[in-house]
Swiss-Prot record:
Keywords: 4Fe-4S, Cell inner membrane, Cell membrane, Iron, Iron-sulfur, Membrane, Metal-binding, NAD, Quinone, Translocase, Transport, Ubiquinone. Its EC number is 7.1.1.-. The keyword Transmembrane does not apply. It is a peripheral membrane protein. The lineage of its organism: Bacteria, Pseudomonadati, Pseudomonadota, Alphaproteobacteria, Hyphomicrobiales. Belongs to the complex I 20 kDa subunit family. This is NADH-quinone oxidoreductase subunit B.
Length: 195
């Protein structure tokens, strides 16, 4: 096994055997003789043997549709930069949508006030299950610079459940992309059927 070298110093990878489970890195059904035989027979014919949970989770992480709930400067500075051609969030399978009824992820960016909190909850309730929330910037995370103001909600997690917090004032585009990748990792880890 391993990498072999020929006389011309060309590295040749060994022929893959079976289908690898992305969660464990081991061949699917390697502890079961039945699945081992099926994988051996079908691997070279282009067939995939997997579970329904793994298939749904794979589809979920590769096609997240996000909408922004932009309240202040983070929505303009961070989201526009991350969506631009330099960082291009769509290469990770994350595409923007305008309607909450078509969205899986809501990115809350900016200072949430008491008057805007019911609107945030209403938009969140319109999203289909499973739904995820990314809190972007220190104002959305905990009130930020306006934390002690009478009209500011001290974090959007007091209104909607938040899955990923992206810190910064404003957060960089790299930080937002890292938050999206962490959300995809969380979806792979927890799955969608349990949620």
């Amino acid at each position: 096994m391993g990498v072999s070298q020929s006389d011309h110093q060309t590295l040749v990878a060994p022929q893959p055997k079976g289908i690898l489970d992305p969660a464990t890195g081991k061949p699917v059904g390697n502890d079961s003789t039945f699945f081992g035989e099926i994988n051996d027979e079908l691997a070279d014919k282009g067939f995939l043997v997997t579970s329904t949970q793994a298939l749904i989770t794979w589809a979920r992480t590769g096609s997240l549709m996000w909408m922004q709930f932009g309240l202040a400067c983070c929505a303009v500075e961070g989201l526009m930069q991350a969506s631009g051609p330099r960082y291009d969030m769509e290469r990770f399978g994350v595409a923007p949508r305008a309607s909450p009824r078509q969205s899986d992820v809501m990115i809350v960016a900016g200072t949430l006030t008491n008057k805007m909190a019911p609107a945030l909850r209403k938009v969140y309730d319109q999203m289909p299950e499973p739904r995820y929330v990314i809190s972007m910037g220190s104002c959305a995370n905990g009130g930020g610079y306006y934390h002690y103001s009478y009209s500011v909600v001290r974090g959007c997690d007091r209104v909607v459940p938040v899955d990923i917090y992206v810190p910064g004032c404003p957060p960089t585009a790299e930080a937002l992309l890292y938050g999206v990748l962490l959300l995809q990792k969380k979806i792979r880890r927890t799955g969608t059927i349990e949620r």
